[in-house]
Structure formats: structure tokens, C-alpha cells
A protein has these predicted regions:
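Catalytic alpha/large subunits of respiratory electron-transfer oxidoreductases
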Residues: 1-177
Length: 177
């Protein structure tokens, strides 16, 4: 018989890691925590799980971070702690979220709107205008760039080493991929 493990998407990364170690020790290879995910179209391209392309110490050295659809304080407390340390060292942290959360560090920019995709597209369009590479047809559509979106794009473009991180709220969005 085949067994599987379904883990809560509310579990922390640390809890999920320990659960998969236990499951594999018991010979269970079928694990999934994407219970709320609605868009699986990236699976065909081999993108099965989001990943952090930085070590935790490297996160502290990022000069600018944009969090999209995330409340790291609850999602990934250890990563949140590293970002807090970075912000205390004058690094910029901005967010695009559907609601305002109680972050334990000062945010440089806070774009609060239910439509994460529209807000992110505004930042992308502003960045493309800054680079002069505005040749994408979808960017020429009626995407209006707000001053706050332009400021986020300007900070990210000026950053020596910046990052955009997608959180759990973004991952359960119907337009995730």
C-alpha cells in the first residue's frame, strides 16, 4: 500500500523539514503541503517548490528586499529575523501585500492592495522604464505606475544586491505562476 503525508501550509519551514525527515525515515515518499495552492501550471516546467536562492547569512547582506504576498514573521521566523537584522543595518525592505501586517521592522515602502499582480506589474513597468527596456507588449498596456511603485522599482534597480521574495499569500493567489 502507498501512504502519503499532507502537511499544513501554515507550518513553518522548520516544521515541514522535520516532518519530511520523519516521513522518509518511515519509507513514505509522497509528501505535499500545497493544500491551498490553486495554480499548478509551473509544475510542468519542473518548478515544484519555491526556494530561497540565498543562505540565511547572505540574506542579512541584501541591500534591498521586496516581499510580495508575505508575512514572514509568521511564515518563516528565522528568515524574518535575518531581514530584521538587515533592516537594522540600514537595508531597505518593502512589501506588496493585500493587508497591512505588523512587521517587527521598519518598511521602506508598503504597497497595500488586494490585487498583488497589478501592484507587481506596476513595479515591473517602472523598472522597465528605468532601464529603457520597455519592449514587452504586456507592459505597454494600460498599466498605471504609482509613485510608490516607481520608488520600489528605483530602490531595487539601485540595489547592489537585491531580492524579490514571494510569500505564502502570493503562492495561493490564483495568478501565482
Amino acid at each position: 500500500t502507498n501512504f502519503g503525508v499532507l502537511a499544513s501550509p501554515n507550518a513553518t519551514l522548520e516544521e515541514l523539514h522535520l516532518l519530511q525527515k520523519l516521513a522518509r525515515r518511515l519509507g513514505i515518499e509522497n509528501l505535499d503541503c500545497r493544500l491551498r495552492q490553486q495554480d499548478f501550471s509551473l509544475d510542468a516546467a519542473g518548478i515544484l517548490a519555491p526556494k530561497l536562492n540565498h543562505s540565511l547569512p547572505e540574506v542579512e547582506s541584501l541591500s534591498d528586499v521586496l516581499l510580495v504576498g508575505s508575512y514572514l514573521r509568521k511564515e518563516l521566523p528565522m528568515l524574518n529575523h535575518r531581514l530584521r537584522k538587515a533592516q537594522l543595518n540600514s537595508k531597505h525592505i518593502s512589501v506588496i501585500n493585500p493587508v497591512e501586517f505588523d512587521f517587527n521592522y521598519r518598511l521602506t515602502h508598503s504597497l497595500i492592495d488586494n490585487d498583488l499582480v497589478q501592484n507587481l506589474m506596476g513595479v515591473v513597468k517602472a523598472a522597465s522604464e528605468l532601464t529603457g527596456k520597455n519592449d514587452q507588449a504586456w507592459l505597454k498596456k494600460s498599466i498605471k505606475v504609482s509613485p510608490e511603485q516607481a520608488a520600489v522599482a528605483k530602490d531595487l534597480m539601485a540595489a547592489k544586491n537585491g531580492a524579490i521574495m514571494l510569500g505564502q499569500i502570493a503562492q495561493v493567489d490564483t495568478h501565482y505562476s
